[in-house]
Amino acid sequence: MYETRESLGSIRFCLGKEDGRMNLAARKHSPPNLRNGILAAVIAAFALAPVALCAQADCLACHGDATATDATGHSIAVDGQKFGASIHGSLQCTNCHADIKGYPHPDKIAPVDCKTCHADQAAALKNSVHADSKDHPCTSCHGNAHEIFPKTDARSAVYPLNVPKTCGQCHSNGGMAGKHGLPSVYPNYIDSIHGFALSKEGLLVAANCQSCHGSHNILSHTNPQSPTYKSNIPKTCGTCHAKIEADYEQGVHGKAVAGGNLKAPVCSDCHTAHAILQPTEAEFRMQSTPICGSCHKDKFSTYRDTFHSQLGSLGGYVETARCWDCHGAHDVRPASDPSSPINQANLIATCGRCHAGANASFVKYQPHANARDRKLSPALYYIRLFMNLLLAGVLIFFMIHTILWVIRSRYNQVKSKAANGGKNA
């Protein structure tokens, strides 16, 4: 409990304007007993208060001056209008600056401890990747401490449309990213389908940084509790893409991940995490096959031998069939599954999407025929073996023929020279 004399000093700080005396409107016109009662009540209230709750106007008498600076030249100005409109506008200055008990106050005051009110957020932050960052106080994300607005207010630094720019202060090329080795993801995000929807179209439902990473409790992607941990990514993306998540869970990839196989692909393996393109874009279609090939190397190799691949890679024809045009995208199923587009019963319909008039003979074509695999393609395997043996036999035959021809030619030259008495013919 603070001493009465300290509380009295606080009364002068809060209510005194010139010489510390109370300036009550009824001072001259109230009966003495009433004035004394009011004074006693005020003194009692402040005597019991641990910290003087001073009116904002008293602080703004100095800090409301836009040119106000401290001894180091750092601005200590506070915009009274903006502060009044902020989420903290109803608070008194000393609610946050609790070590100030009177005026004049020390030049150096204690840093504001936000967890006094925001204990849950502080606890979450303590366990996050930002916990050890000395350069990451609350104001790094929420903005000027005296101008913090609700996240639903367009003026807020954490309003959905503003979040990428706020995070980009650190996670962009140079600056904090270069200094601390942070991922520089802002440039990729802002050009992605999510970034375009947010920044160009103003869609509040488009995914921003918080949508995937969280806010105060941001965990490393290597932490199993993180929403960006590999096995959690389908659920995270499914927050918006519910149908796609359901399809993915029914496919071979989703079942593999659910079974603990973290080598199986999740959303970010195919779409990337931040530079997500519209699937209909030419760039995405051109990139999609090598992405599948990074896991399915044998199938990618045989695909590259096909007309589909050569038309796309050499001819630059974007609309040629890619892996997902035949196998599906999210609910990829084995050929043995009756619902798979590459099941024998569905091949005519699958091929018919591009090849009108496709029939039973047409779908006998083997898109992944492998002449090196005797079990998969026995006819091709033996044809290739025969052609290789034929080629080798022809080369060996003519190599022997050439060597014998050279020997015979040399022999004839020597014989002819001997017949002419040592002279060349």
Where are these regions (language model features)?
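N-terminal secretory signal peptides that target proteins for export/translocation
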Residues: 1-35
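A generic alpha-helix propensity feature with a strong bias for hydrophobic helices
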Residues: 11-13, 32-37, 53, 109, ...
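Short sequence/structural segments immediately N-terminal
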Residues: 24, 50-425
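Bacterial N-terminal signal peptides
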Residues: 37-51
